[in-house]
Regions:
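Nucleotide/pyrophosphate-binding catalytic subdomain
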Residues: 1-232, 236, 329, 405-407
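Active-site C-terminal subdomain of aminotransferase-like
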Residues: 244-257, 281
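Non-catalytic alpha-helical coupling and interface elements of nucleotide-dependent molecular machines
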Residues: 45, 69, 244-247, 345, ...
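A conserved regulatory-domain signal marking ACT and ACT-like small-molecule sensing domains
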Residues: 257-424
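A structural preference for short, hydrophobic beta-strand core positions in alpha/beta folds
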Residues: 117-119, 248, 316, 392
Length: 424
């Protein structure tokens, strides 16, 4: 709403080095409110079904008109809304419809700030098959922003070679911000959101978890992969590659320093050894046993090929001398279960093959673990004390994380036990 626009302007004017801003679409103003992006998707769905979408579109238009009126803006918002409405009515694709939330918000913010507006479709490029074209995008973005003029670039979307609009996945404005940061060789990428950085654990499971002041990109990748969701995980790659630190900040608490993400975070804040804990439920573990498996050439490839042929990617691959376990998403695996198992049996002739469903995978992540003896012992002792049965263990050679598998029923208590062992 207009109040958030004013907060954004205050933040931008606090530091003249803030020259580029990437807005997302308006979110919820209150608990039962609709996000503008959801309303735009609804318009597309209603139009595709032959239903009248105008009432939904009127809700969207009213949101933007209210903001423009309260801020006294001069941009021709009516013409922009009419263009969007006409294209939805003409059958524009879902990506075009969804992207207009950021586009319209960008027009308003540029007018409010007195900054230049640049349509992201001019520089954020995808290949014909829908893959993000990072290098072409970086070249175009760097060229267009080379004059140093303060610019608003709407997030979330870009375009195919033919100009058709293509979006990133939800939360993709984070990615656009990282793209712009890389293109202008920024000293820091500030990602302003509604939380003051990352927490060491999910506050829905651990009451009032400690804040994370600094974290490395590698640590964040581990935590994001396992479910931590403050920043879109794909937003890390452009700035990580360029060595640009990211600062997660809170729009509603701008004085809070937030969390700094960098290539090499300082080691003076390693207490309490771990950086964070994250996990996900709903995995299936396929355990394949065969005597002398380790001496059979191509055994692992044959097993994984059965999953690949059925478009099921594996999450983890713990192994023993005569045992190979494949951890996959239970939801993705379930409809293809029989055909995959039959394929594995046909190709490898195992002694036994067993499937364990309803498994949770929990990652304990921290650059400090490599410097501290007995980290794994503390972790497993805490789980044992809490009466939790460890179903799977996986630790990489980098010692950046320890991954454990437990029954879904033990998910919350496992995170609580690990947190209490290292933090409390």
């Amino acid at each position: 709403d207009a109040g958030q626009f004013r907060k954004v302007k205050d933040i931008l004017l606090l530091d003249e080095a803030r020259q580029y801003v990437i807005p997302s679409a308006p979110g919820r103003r209150f608990k039962d409110d609709d996000k503008v992006t959801d309303l735009l998707y609804r318009c597309h769905k209603q139009k595709s079904a032959g239903e009248d979408y105008q009432d939904t579109f009127d809700l969207i238009a009213a949101r933007y008109m209210d903001i423009a009126e309260e801020l006294g803006l001069h941009v021709d918002l009516g013409a922009a809304l009419d263009e969007v409405n006409e294209k939805i009515d003409a059958g524009a694709n879902a990506d075009y419809c969804a992207s207009r939330g950021e586009y319209l918000n960008g027009l308003l913010l540029a007018d409010f700030m007195g900054w230049r507006f640049m349509d992201a479709a001019e520089a954020v490029k995808f290949t014909a098959d829908g893959a993000f074209d990072a290098e072409t995008t970086n070249t175009l973005m760097a060229e267009k922003l080379s004059d140093g003029v303060p610019t608003v670039v709407p997030g979330f979307y870009g375009s195919y070679p033919d100009g058709t609009i293509k979006t990133f996945s939800r939360g993709g404005s984070d990615i656009t911000g990282a793209i712009v940061a890389r293109a202008v060789e920024a000293s820091v990428y500030e990602n302003w959101t509604d939380v003051s950085g990352f927490l060491m654990a999910d506050p829905r499971i651990v009451p009032h978890p400690r804040e994370i002041s600094s974290i490395t990109y590698k640590e964040l990748r581990e935590l994001s992969y396992m479910g931590a969701s403050v920043l879109h995980e794909d937003a890390m790659f452009p700035v990580h590659k360029a060595g640009i630190p990211t600062n997660i900040r809170n729009t509603n608490d701008p004085s809070h320093p937030g969390t700094i993400i960098s290539l090499n975070a300082p080691h003076d804040d390693l207490h309490p050894t771990i950086t964070g804990i994250a996990g996900r439920k709903g995995f299936s573990v396929i355990s394949i046993e065969k005597a002398m498996m380790n001496s059979e050439l191509g055994f692992g490839r044959k097993v994984l090929q059965a999953f690949e042929e059925n478009s099921v990617s594996f999450e983890h691959l713990p192994t023993g001398i005569d045992t190979l376990c494949v951890v996959v998403s239970g939801e993705v695996f379930a409809p293809k279960r029989d055909i995959i198992l039959s394929r594995i049996v046909h190709e490898t002739n195992p002694d036994t093959i067993t499937v364990y469903d309803n498994m949770s995978i929990i990652a304990t992540v921290g650059r400090g673990m490599v410097h501290n003896c007995g980290t794994a012992a503390r972790l497993f002792a805490a789980m044992s004390k809490a009466g939790i049965n460890v179903r799977m263990i996986d630790q990489g050679s980098s010692e950046l994380s320890i991954i454990v598998g437990v029954n879904d029923a033990d998910y919350e208590s496992t995170i609580q036990a690990i947190y209490n062992a290292f933090v409390k």
